[in-house]
């Protein structure tokens, strides 16, 4: 039965992890799939837009809205061989806990895995530290059950392109639209290994297959409401070990390139000043040997022999000359990950009056070989404005989480943020990158989507129109309303 939460919930769900706050008209809780159908019916009849919401961990404000906020309850998980089906409200950590007995996992690991829902991960095309080796959510979705605004419940699976082109309804329309524009879609594909900006239209048609689930992964609740997801799983690696070393900006590309050659699962980056400026230097003291600006965390996983071979390769490479800290005990590796994942929490303690680290350009991603250039470009944008900032991210994929310190309540500071976003996004696009590697567009970046997809934005807007002609789902998120 569809439930309406009390008025006290309106304030709670007016915010997520972003900086935009919007008080909704109502908060609905769907316990079953038919409740989602009923919620969409209420949206149609009332004329109020609807925002599907998971755990509210989204950063560019995908899960707030002025109309109906739709929550889903239920934690059903069904493991079957190499796949697992679950409801969207399942927390990522609980999903992997359920898979543990089978010796498998779904390896996409956002730092918010203890809180984020798998439905949110699908809607956002979430990634994480180990995306370097394992890929993003889009690489693991096998099928989706969705409720569409005009067509009701649908099971989305990959199908033959030939069959999709002859279909009626939304499937045929979208298949023909993408097939007729494959050249321009491919031409505007960012030269990056991870991307959560725009609809992933370049992943839908491949090898004679029309892979419709991939269109909905990363669509941020703008095309339909996911009610069940089926994921591919992989065996849990037998061992994990880590190398931690320091790097200057000048050395960074060379060091990360050398680590990539050894075959890591993750290559992570933290600016030590985040800890030093908040009086938390002790947390990183065991890794400090040379005094350089950055810490690089590199994890290797696999069989015992594979990991041993990787560590031997590190010792034979130029990395050995940089006095790395080698962590071979499981508890030491876990502690190092805790330090890496504490970065944003520690950064939250950085306050200069009303100024705090804010998102906006916190998810830029460049071609892998341009990590140093990306840092230099964004740093220049900050320093010319005299702004303090924090810096960390996924070095292996050249995906940086850099946040300037600004006051979200100051209209002057928010003007600075808009200027920063336009300049930084323009620079990263010239590098062949994307304005979002894993956090998505949301309301915060929607206005800039035309900058990234100058030739294909109209295709994305047409897809939105096909599935949601009344613009009931998350208007203003990703694709701006007409």
Residue ranges and their predicted role:
Residues 1-45, 55-83, 111, 134, ...:
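N-terminal flexible segment immediately upstream of the FAD-binding catalytic core
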Residues 2-6, 28-30, 49-54, 61, ...:
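General beta-strand structural signal in soluble alpha/beta enzymes
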Residues 14-50, 70-112, 122, 126-173, ...:
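N-terminal glycine-rich flavin-associated loop
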Residues 22, 26, 242-245, 292-302, ...:
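Short, hydrophobic beta-strand segments
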Residues 58-59, 121-130, 209-231, 393-399, ...:
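Conserved phosphate/anionic-ligand binding catalytic regions in large, soluble enzymes, centered on
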Residues 123, 131-134, 141-340, 450, ...:
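C-terminal substrate-binding/cap subdomain adjacent to the FAD-binding core in PCMH-type
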Residues 348-354, 445-482:
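Activity-critical C-terminal alpha-helical subdomain
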Residues 409-429, 449, 453-461:
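Helical (often loop-to-helix) elements that flank the catalytic cores of nucleotide-handling enzymes
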């Amino acid at each position: 039965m569809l439930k309406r939460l009390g008025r006290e919930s309106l304030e709670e769900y007016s915010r997520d992890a972003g900086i935009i706050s919007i008080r909704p008209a109502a908060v609905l809780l769907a316990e079953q799939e038919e409740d989602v159908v009923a919620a969409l019916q209420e949206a149609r009849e009332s004329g109020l837009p609807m925002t599907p919401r998971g755990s509210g961990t989204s950063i560019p404000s995908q899960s707030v809205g002025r109309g109906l906020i739709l929550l889903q309850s239920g934690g059903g998980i069904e493991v079957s061989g190499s796949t697992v089906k679950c409801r969207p409200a399942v927390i990522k950590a609980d999903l992997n806990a359920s898979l543990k007995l089978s010796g498998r996992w779904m390896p996409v690991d956002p730092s918010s895995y203890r809180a984020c829902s798998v439905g949110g991960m699908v809607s956002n095309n979430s990634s994480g530290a180990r995306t370097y080796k394992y890929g993003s959510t889009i690489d693991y979705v096998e099928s989706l059950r969705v409720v569409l605004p005009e067509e009701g419940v649908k099971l989305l699976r990959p199908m033959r392109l030939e069959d999709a082109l002859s279909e009626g309804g939304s499937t045929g329309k979208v298949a023909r639209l993408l097939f007729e524009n494959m050249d321009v879609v491919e031409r505007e594909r960012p030269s990056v290994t991870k991307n959560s900006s725009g609809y992933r239209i370049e992943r839908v048609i491949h090898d004679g297959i029309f892979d419709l689930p991939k269109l909905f992964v990363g669509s941020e609740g703008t095309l339909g409401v996911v009610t069940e997801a089926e994921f591919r799983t992989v065996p849990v690696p037998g061992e994990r070990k880590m190398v931690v070393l320091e790097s200057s900006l000048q050395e960074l590309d060379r060091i990360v390139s050398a680590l990539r050659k050894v075959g890591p699962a993750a290559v992570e980056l933290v600016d030590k000043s985040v800890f030093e400026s908040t009086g938390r230097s002790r947390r990183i003291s065991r890794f400090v040997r040379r005094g350089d600006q950055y810490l690089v965390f590199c994890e290797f996983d696999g069989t015992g022999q594979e990991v041993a071979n990787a560590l031997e390769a590190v010792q034979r490479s130029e990395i050995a000359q940089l006095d790395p800290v080698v962590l071979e005990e499981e508890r030491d590796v876990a502690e190092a990950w805790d330090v890496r994942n504490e970065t944003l929490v520690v950064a939250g303690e950085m306050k200069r009056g009303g100024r705090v680290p804010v998102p906006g350009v916190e998810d830029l991603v460049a071609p892998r070989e341009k990590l140093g250039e990306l840092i230099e470009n964004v740093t220049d944008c900050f320093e010319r404005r005299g702004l303090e900032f924090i810096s960390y991210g996924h070095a292996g994929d050249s995906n940086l989480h850099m946040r300037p310190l600004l006051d979200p309540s100051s209209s002057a500071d928010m003007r600075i943020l808009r200027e920063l976003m336009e300049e930084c996004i323009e620079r990263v696009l010239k590098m062949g990158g994307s304005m979002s590697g894993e956090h998505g567009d949301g309301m915060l970046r929607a206005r800039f989507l035309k900058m990234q997809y100058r030739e294909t934005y109209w295709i994305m807007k047409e897809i939105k129109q096909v599935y949601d002609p009344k613009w009931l789902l998350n208007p203003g998120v990703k694709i701006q309303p007409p």
